[in-house]
């Protein structure tokens, strides 16, 4: 429903009456909070004017983006063309998307393209002229969930200098393999990915020191994990409702960060295999009808044999066949290396091509 109106404009809430919800989000106090990457809204529009009002999280209180590495980054696409690309600096910001003499018709998409751990942002309202209209778009043909780390996030993908470090300014999930795969397959999708996270250990510079905080399995059943709060709430304290998104396919791309800890140690690798198998059981429990693809390789495939063993154990224990492996090619310097030695968009295009073929083959899409 519309939240308010007058002679000149109508303000709509970002709820399911007016828009289609994308990704893991949370509606609270009439604000739709965009949690993981690529979460947000999509809607049909017929209007002369469009403004989007955004609410920042607890860290959105800066005068400039200079020196900031964790600000939420949002984009607005109109008929597939990026019309807005902004970092959220303040608690309340309103952005003009267009204000024209002629009516604009088509599809609008508002999504967050930076990752949850660093920041989230909320959609307060969608404003159009008094005779403007919006409505939810139709769901896509298929549904995919991607579970991963920085590679899935599009970490540093806009910065082709491998010596540079992380900032949300150069992170863009729309240029990474997961987004490209889902788009090519006409699929709605959820991204459950955080940079530096793993199965038994997040990234660690010292293989003798286990990073037990940054574990995807620990927070998979939660809304997410964020260092900031929103309206006095913490993302990691809220359970995710798995009925909100029921995927046909789940792609898991974890193990790159675990390798920094395992470092070829057989005992550690055995622990990785066991915990990966346990996580597969959790994923199956929450998504009983999904086909699972377990992948690795873009930034190294040292734990690929461990994932093979985990999949074998999972299949034997559950007497199922709806799971398979995808061995990605390791990135090449000639394709460009992005910030902090992460894959370029060209590398992601190659990975997407391979994954698309695998999914089409198994799912007959």
Residue ranges and their predicted role:
Residues 178-188, 282-291, 314-320:
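A structural motif corresponding to the C-terminal end of an alpha-helix
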Residues 36, 163-266, 298-308, 342:
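Conserved SGNH/GDSL esterase-like catalytic core that processes O-acyl groups on lipids
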């Amino acid at each position: 429903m519309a939240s308010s109106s007058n002679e000149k404009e109508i303000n709509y809430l970002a709820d399911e009456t007016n828009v289609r919800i994308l990704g893991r989000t949370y509606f609270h106090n009439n604000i739709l909070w965009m949690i993981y990457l690529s979460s947000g809204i999509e809607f049909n529009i017929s209007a002369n004017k469009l403004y989007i009002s955004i609410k920042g999280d607890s860290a959105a209180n800066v005068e400039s983006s200079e020196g900031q590495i964790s600000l939420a980054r949002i984009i607005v696409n109109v008929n597939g063309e990026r019309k807005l690309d902004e970092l959220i600096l303040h608690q309340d910001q309103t952005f003009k998307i267009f204000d024209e003499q002629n009516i604009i018709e088509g599809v609008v998409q508002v999504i967050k393209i930076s990752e949850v751990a660093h920041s989230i942002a909320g959609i307060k309202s969608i404003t159009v002229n008094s005779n403007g209209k919006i409505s939810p778009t139709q769901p896509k043909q298929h549904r995919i969930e991607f579970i991963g780390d920085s590679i899935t996030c599009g970490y540093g993908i806009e910065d082709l200098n491998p010596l540079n470090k992380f900032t949300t300014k150069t992170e863009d999930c729309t240029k990474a393999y997961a987004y490209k795969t889902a788009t090519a397959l006409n699929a709605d999708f959820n991204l459950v990915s955080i940079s530096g996270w793993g199965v038994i250990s997040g990234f660690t510079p010292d293989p003798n020191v286990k990073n037990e905080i940054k574990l995807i399995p620990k927070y998979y059943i939660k809304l997410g994990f964020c260092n900031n709060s929103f309206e006095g709430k913490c993302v990691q304290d809220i359970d995710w409702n798995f009925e909100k998104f029921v995927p046909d396919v789940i792609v898991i791309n974890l193990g790159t960060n675990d390798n920094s800890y395992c470092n070829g140690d057989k005992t550690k690798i055995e622990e990785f295999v066991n915990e990966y198998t346990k996580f597969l059981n959790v994923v199956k429990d929450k998504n009983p009808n999904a086909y699972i693809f377990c992948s690795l390789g873009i930034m190294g495939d040292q734990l690929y044999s461990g994932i093979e063993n985990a999949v074998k154990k999972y299949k034997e224990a559950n007497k199922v066949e709806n799971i398979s492996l995808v061995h990605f090619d390791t990135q090449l310097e000639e394709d460009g290396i992005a910030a902090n030695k992460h894959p370029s968009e060209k590398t992601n295009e190659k990975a997407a091509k391979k994954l698309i073929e695998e999914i089409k083959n198994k799912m007959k899409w």
